[in-house]
Amino acid sequence: ATLLQIFARNAKRGTALALENGTAWSSDPRELAAADLYILAVSDAAITTLAESLPIPADAAVVHTAGGIGIEALPARFDRRGVLYPLQTFTQGRSVDFAKIPLFVEGNDDSFTSELEAFARNLSRTVYRADSDRRVRLHLAAVFACNFVNHLYALGGEILHGTELPFDVLKPLIAETAAKAVDSGDPHRVQTGPAVRGDLPTLRRHEAALAHDPRLLRIYESLSQDIWESSKKTSYRPKRSFSTWTA
């Protein structure tokens, strides 16, 4: 497969990406290159508008890259339309090894799904077929495993404010926690902390330390409760009933 063109409104990003990939760039729809496959890597809200506005031939293949949006976001005038969803977080300036990113594909029929699957295997070692319902669940799982977790990192940094301790002190802990979760295959099995242990004195001290910040206290109590409830579904059993913590 050959990348023929980067089409982007942002000239700086578009030209930089085109230069990096040794291809052409344009922001003018009249200069849109003829291609076998058009990949719309834009925000969810922009998918339909962009697909309708570009002069893409009806017999061309068109896909978007959104996890939580179905094929129906693409106009029905395209004979071959689908989804090519990479399960990864992307940030400008950070490189990722695309071969290690799971790709999830769906086409509007079996034939095009097979084509997309073959194309995806040129990009990644891990490719799955996933219809809209499965992708919505997958996208939701990714929000919990990525976006929410990163927010908790930020809250951890907030709690350190005023201690003269940098966020760097948390980095080895973050790395080891993530590594254990990945290696275990079931993060429930490697859950640690006062909530899963039923350590009431520590829970009380933490609650007292957060008494000045109702927002963080609410989050702390909610997560502690859920860790406790989740632990009851595994082979690990805390020594204390959660109801006795809040009594």
Task: State what each model feature region is.
Residues 11-95:
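Rossmann-like NAD(P)(H) cofactor-binding subdomain of soluble oxidoreductases
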Residues 2, 13, 17-20, 95-183:
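Internal alpha-helical scaffold of NAD(P)-dependent oxidoreductase catalytic cores
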Residues 14, 35, 47, 71, ...:
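A general structural signal for well-ordered alpha-helical segments in protein cores
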Residues 177-238:
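Interdomain hinge/lid region at the active-site interface
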Residues 5-9:
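Short internal beta-strands
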Residues 235-247:
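Acidic, proline/serine/threonine- and glycine-rich low-complexity intrinsically disordered segments
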Residues 75, 166-174, 229-234:
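Membrane-interacting alpha-helical segments
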